[in-house]
A protein has these predicted regions:
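Conserved AdoMet
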Residues: 3-116, 254-256
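A short glycine-rich, Lys/Arg-flanked "PGG" loop and its adjoining helix->strand segment in the class I
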Residues: 237-249
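Conserved class I S-adenosyl-L-methionine
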Residues: 110-123, 145-147
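Conserved SAM-binding loop of SAM-dependent methyltransferases across substrates and taxa
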Residues: 122-139
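Active-site catalytic pocket residues across diverse enzymes, especially alpha/beta-hydrolases
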Residues: 98, 102, 133-137, 163
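A structural alpha-helix within SAM-dependent methyltransferase catalytic domains
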Residues: 95, 130-134, 244
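Extended basic-aromatic, gly/pro-enriched interface segments that bind polyanionic ligands
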Residues: 118, 139-223, 227-238, 260-262, ...
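Class I S-adenosyl-L-methionine
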Residues: 258-280
Length: 280
């Protein structure tokens, strides 16, 4: 048994069961080295539910239709590491290449832009996209919508609130900070709120990428960064096929710094570091 002296009994079999369940529900592949992480993150769930052993928790996940607990289970095991303008070369490409090309190539009749931030976490990514859009495209005449989705309802709630600690924005250029964030005072001192002009562009929705996608229409640009690192290759292939089907021809896809579509899908061609264009 693993961690016998610990607060909860957690065996090899329990760990394998957890891996199987998270893979089935969310397509996430947990590595062998994640045992301690699984134990520490899920111990809180056992404590809250008044359970003594991990096998009881696995049974609960497998047999009950408690979607709330399944959500908590997924929330506990998904990692949320994000920052404003993380992997800044993506935002430079968006500002300097992609949006100017849209302005140049789209006549007066097709000034519609649809962007999807898939796995948006606590919201820094879609708000960063929105800043670039507002700074680059003319204020009038363009119909822009950003869809921001995540599996984790807790991080989505943070994203939707749009309130962040000062630390999260202190490294942004001052002009950007002043333009897009309102400083809190009183009880909100030390915090900032995202400007309404950014919030207006974004719709936040809970979405499991493994399930059906309710959205209609196609996207010009998809950000899916540091999401598929948790998925096995067949799951990645299936996901990128679905993305391609939901994008315009020549649509652009941004993936995370350690992710690659090499031998995963034929439907995108690389344009640069972790930037792809739909080709099929």
């Amino acid at each position: 048994t693993l961690f016998r002296s610990a607060e909860f009994e957690f065996s090899d079999q329990d760990f394998q069961n957890i891996r199987r369940i998270i893979n089935r529900i969310a397509g996430i592949s947990l590595a062998d080295g994640k045992r301690e992480l699984v134990y520490s993150r899920l111990s809180r769930r056992l404590r809250q539910l008044g359970l003594r052993r991990f096998d009881e928790y696995c049974t609960l996940l497998e047999t009950s239709n408690d979607t709330v607990e399944l959500g908590e289970f997924v929330n506990a095991l998904t990692t949320n590491l994000t920052a404003f303008f993380r992997e800044s070369h993506h935002f430079d490409f968006l500002a300097n290449e992609l949006l100017p090309a849209f302005m140049r190539d789209r006549g007066l009749t097709n000034r519609r832009l649809r962007i999807w931030s898939a796995g948006c976490s606590t919201g820094e990514e879609p708000y960063s996209i929105a800043m670039v859009v507002r700074e680059t495209l003319p204020a009038v005449g363009w119909d822009v919508k950003i869809l921001a989705t995540d599996l984790d309802s807790n991080v989505l709630a943070t994203a939707q609130r749009g309130i962040y600690d000062w630390d999260r924005v202190k490294d942004l250029p001052e002009t950007r900070r002043r333009r897009w964030f309102l400083k809190g005072c009183g009880a909100q001192a030390g915090q900032v709120r995202v400007a309404p002009a950014l919030c207006d562009l974004i719709s936040f929705r809970r979405l499991n990428l493994m399930e059906d996608w309710p959205m209609r229409g196609v996207f010009d640009i998809v950000f899916c960064r540091n999401v598929v690192i948790y998925f096995d290759k067949p799951t990645q292939s299936a996901l990128f096929e679905r993305f391609a089907d939901r994008m315009i021809k020549q649509g652009h896809l941004f993936v995370g710094h350690s992710e690659s579509l090499f031998k995963v899908t034929e439907r995108f061609t690389p344009l640069g570091k972790t930037i792809y264009q739909r080709c099929l």
